[in-house]
């Protein structure tokens, strides 16, 4: 049982390898692209209405209810127990998928899958407690890349087994169960961290900027920095008063430390969201992520509606693999694009939100399954491109701790929005719309997002132009004279 508490090695390489193996097998789930054909087929005999209006909404509700408690618990218990909990939830989910029957059982499946997605935060946060700051960027890149590779590999494997070997969907779920079981076993061998970002932080440690957190964050943003970056890092919460020394900190009751943590969280979030740039990028993140998750949750039902799996060959695995790969390429390519994001960022959000809306309208109006697949490819790739930019714009001037806070709150707000959409559009207690009409609503939703950010971008461009006109030197002045104030107001382009 020592594997729960100790590690055979303190090397960051050992930790990274174990974590990446866990990430690979937890995401290598070939059954996912064919979940709807499996549930609607002879194994489960569920109707489209039951899946859409009764079963799938449970995932959204459970994810929302579990997210905030899990975020707090993850830091308090120092990550590893939550990663193990995720592995257990994976196993329960697929055992119920394989051997459970009926709507109620599938609702329980969705609850445990909500637990899986809520505990996913531990996988990404774990590395910052066991890996030294100079390795943050590299390890973060490994952990994120391996999940994309695993999901793509699982989708390709599923398509090959279904199309060439005519394998039953049931056995795809058996393979997924075996994969997540391997992930659970490897989670037991992760080293137990001695510290965490907040509740078990070391007051004296140096805080690295989040430019070393994400592999796309390579340079410091040269525009206006939000005020929150100038404040004391959240990891120093127990000593924020300036009067608590180490000995006094150890004598504090846990309840008092917890109160200090929550108070500091509130102050940090208030300061961070006071930055207009961070606020608007976070606003797009929340609304777009809510819509994106909703599409992922219901797109297979739309495909089955356009081309029933019992009557025709389906290529869900190939489409998911292509979409994931295309999104990864788009996210990688944006790191080499020089754009003045301060000036044109909101315009980019508006333009690509129009693209998202158009792709969803295409998926609604077309009767051709291949056009529907194409719309999904465009939608997923453009979202992954934009979310990469949004992560950079939000995180570039924040400490690791404050980025984690903003990320958690943005995700929670996205879930609140998604829950509202689900209750109104999907749930049988709401409008209970058929799946095709739902995608018309989702397309309109992204069109509204595009309109909001188009107006915002035009305001920024007009304000910047007016400011430059006011600051322009008079014609009679010496053109060789330098103007420090003009240089300080120039907005530099940023290379991601």
Curated annotation (Swiss-Prot):
It catalyses: thiamine(out) + H(+)(in) = thiamine(in) + H(+)(out); pyridoxine(out) + n H(+)(out) = pyridoxine(in) + n H(+)(in). Keywords: Glycoprotein, Membrane, Transmembrane, Transmembrane helix, Transport. One of its GO terms (biological process) is thiamine transport. Gene3D superfamilies: MFS general substrate transporter like domains. One of its GO terms (molecular function) is thiamine transmembrane transporter activity. The record marks 86-87, 91, 93-94, 168, 173 as: Essential for pyridoxine transport. The keyword Cell membrane does not apply. Residues 218-233 have a biased composition (Basic and acidic residues). Its main location: membrane. It is found in: Membrane. This is Thiamine transporter 2. It comes from Macaca fascicularis.
């Amino acid at each position: 049982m020592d594997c729960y508490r100790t590690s055979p090695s303190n090397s960051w390489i050992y930790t990274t390898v174990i974590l990446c193996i866990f990430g690979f097998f937890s995401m290598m789930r070939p059954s996912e692209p064919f979940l709807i054909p499996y549930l609607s087929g002879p194994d489960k005999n569920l109707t489209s209405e039951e899946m859409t209006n009764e079963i799938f909404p449970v995932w959204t509700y459970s994810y929302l209810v579990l997210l905030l408690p899990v975020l707090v618990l993850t830091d308090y218990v120092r990550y590893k127990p939550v990663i193990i909990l995720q592995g257990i939830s994976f196993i329960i989910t697929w055992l119920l998928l394989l051997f459970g029957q009926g709507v109620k059982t599938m609702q329980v499946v969705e609850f445990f899958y909500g637990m899986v997605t809520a505990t996913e935060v531990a996988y990404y946060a774990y590395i910052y407690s066991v890996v030294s700051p100079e390795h943050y960027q590299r390890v973060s890149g490994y952990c994120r890349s391996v999940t994309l590779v695993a999901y793509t590999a699982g989708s390709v494997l599923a398509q090959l087994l279904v199309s060439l070997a005519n394998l039953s969907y049931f056995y795809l779920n058996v393979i997924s169960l075996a994969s997540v079981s391997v992930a659970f076993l490897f989670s037991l061998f992760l080293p137990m961290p001695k510290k965490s970002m907040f509740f078990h932080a070391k007051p004296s440690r140096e805080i690295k900027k989040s430019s070393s957190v994400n592999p796309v964050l390579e340079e410091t943003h040269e525009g206006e920095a939000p005020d929150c970056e100038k404040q004391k890092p959240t990891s120093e919460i127990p000593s924020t008063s300036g009067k608590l020394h180490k000995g006094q900190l150890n004598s504090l009751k846990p309840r008092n430390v917890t109160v200090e943590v929550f108070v500091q969280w509130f102050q940090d979030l208030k300061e961070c969201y006071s930055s207009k740039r961070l606020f608007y990028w976070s606003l797009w993140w929340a609304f777009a992520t809510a819509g994106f998750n909703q599409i992922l949750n219901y797109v297979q039902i739309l495909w089955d509606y356009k081309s029933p799996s019992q009557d025709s060959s389906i290529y869900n695995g190939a489409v998911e693999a292509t979409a994931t790969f295309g999104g990864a390429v788009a996210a990688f390519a944006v790191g080499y694009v020089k754009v003045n994001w301060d000036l044109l960022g909101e315009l980019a959000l508006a333009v690509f939100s129009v693209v998202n809306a158009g792709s969803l309208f295409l998926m609604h109006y077309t009767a051709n399954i291949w056009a529907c697949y194409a719309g999904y490819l465009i939608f997923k790739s453009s979202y992954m491109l934009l979310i990469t930019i949004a992560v950079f714009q939000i995180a570039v001037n924040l400490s690791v701790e404050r980025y984690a806070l903003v990320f958690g709150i943005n995700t929670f707000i996205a879930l609140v929005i998604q829950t509202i959409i689900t209750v109104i559009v999907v749930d049988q207690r709401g409008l209970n719309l058929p799946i095709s009409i739902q995608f018309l609503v989702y397309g309109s939703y992204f069109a509204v997002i595009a309109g909001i950010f188009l107006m915002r971008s035009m305001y920024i461009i007009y304000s910047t132009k007016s400011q430059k006109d006011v600051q322009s030197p008079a014609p009679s002045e010496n053109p060789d004279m330098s103007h420090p104030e003009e240089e300080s107001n120039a907005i530099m382009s940023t290379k991601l």
